Amino acid sequence: MHQYELMVILDPEIDERTVAPSLDKFLNVVRNDGGTIDNVDIWGRRRLAYEINKKSEGIYAVVQLTATGDTTKELDRQLKLSEAVMRTKVLRADEAIAQVAAAQKRADEKAARKAAAAEKTVTEKVGV
């Protein structure tokens, strides 16, 4: 079993009070296969970066769970069949951490190059 993170964007037309119970229905797939739900974090209504199904907002939810790969595939399949679900993304937690670390490393390297270039420019101006 592995740790996974699931992000779901739900249709903004559904009532926000029904988000948790409807998610719980889907998460029973994980529980029935012997997995566990570690954390459910409902972010609420947020503006989308781009329109999905002609909608500019969505209700975001992030779920941390422990399950097998087959269980997460079945969960993702069932979520995609629901009309209330606009988008889903399932990531293995260790892969997500590696992606964040790689992005941070690239940002640090870029900042270091920028600082070195700025220092070189200042040194050249002072030396002239």
Swiss-Prot record:
Provide the transmembrane region boundaries.
none
Q: Does the keyword Cytoplasm apply?
A: no
Coiled-coil annotation reads none
Is the keyword Magnesium in the record? Answer: no
GO: which molecular function terms? small ribosomal subunit rRNA binding; structural constituent of ribosome
Naming one, the record's GO cellular component terms include: ribosome
Listed under GO biological process in this entry are: translation
* CDD domains from the UniProt entry: bS6
What are the protein's UniProt keywords?
Ribonucleoprotein, Ribosomal protein, RNA-binding, rRNA-binding
List, alphabetically, the Pfam families matched. Answer: Ribosomal_S6
PROSITE patterns from the UniProt entry: RIBOSOMAL_S6 (PS01048)
Purpose: Binds together with bS18 to 16S ribosomal RNA.
Please give the family membership noted in the entry: Belongs to the bacterial ribosomal protein bS6 family.
Against NCBIfam families, the record matches this protein to: S6
Protein name (Swiss-Prot/TrEMBL): Small ribosomal subunit protein bS6
Q: Which organism is it from?
A: Leifsonia xyli subsp. xyli (strain CTCB07)
Gene name, per UniProt, is rpsF
